[in-house]
């Protein structure tokens, strides 16, 4: 994957939401970078207000990404995989009981945008709903008050599956 493709994906994923609860975001993106030209493999947090990646772990993350995604190899085989960390406490303070739903709504909207951006760039994408919550939080060195994982995602070059062709 090229840096231009990754930039386009991140820009598309972080466009402000137009919803009744729009305002500050509750979901933080963490990227497991495996194969992005010119970007060292590692785990990065994405800061949309600065359009900046901050590396928090160095080295090959393929085994970790797959393992954290309940052993799903596609998280390790993709060019980049994502953990979406939702700040449920802040959402609850802002929106009461509905905050929990708004965090998941935001993660779903980000996932939809990741699908659309990947498809527009000729890449494949898939949401991953199975992951180890506590292991992800520990791996990313997040304290409980920093949020919890709500969704995983992977983007890379598609591998055609003849079983799916009609």
Regions found by a protein language model. Name each.
Residues 152-166:
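C-terminal helix-cap and adjacent tail motif
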Residues 1-80:
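N-terminal amphipathic, basic helical "cap/leader" segment at the start of enzyme domains
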Residues 40-43, 92-96, 162-166:
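Short conserved micro-motifs at the rims of enzyme active sites and ligand-binding pockets
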């Amino acid at each position: 994957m090229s840096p231009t493709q990754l930039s386009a994906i991140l820009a598309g994923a972080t466009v402000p939401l137009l919803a009744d609860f729009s305002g500050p975001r509750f979901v933080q993106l963490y990227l497991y970078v495996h194969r992005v030209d010119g970007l060292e493999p590692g785990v990065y947090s994405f800061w949309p207000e600065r359009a900046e990646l901050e590396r928090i772990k160095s080295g090959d993350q393929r085994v970790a990404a797959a393992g954290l995604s309940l052993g799903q190899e596609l998280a390790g085989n993709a060019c980049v995989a994502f953990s979406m960390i939702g700040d449920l406490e802040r959402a609850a303070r802002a929106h009461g009981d509905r905050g929990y739903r708004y965090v998941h709504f935001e993660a779903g909207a980000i996932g939809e945008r990741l699908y659309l951006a990947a498809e527009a760039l000729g890449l494949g994408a898939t949401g991953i709903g199975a992951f180890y919550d506590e292991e992800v939080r520990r791996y990313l060195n997040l304290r409980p008050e920093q949020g919890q994982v709500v969704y995983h995602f992977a983007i890379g070059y598609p591998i055609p599956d003849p079983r799916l062709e009609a």
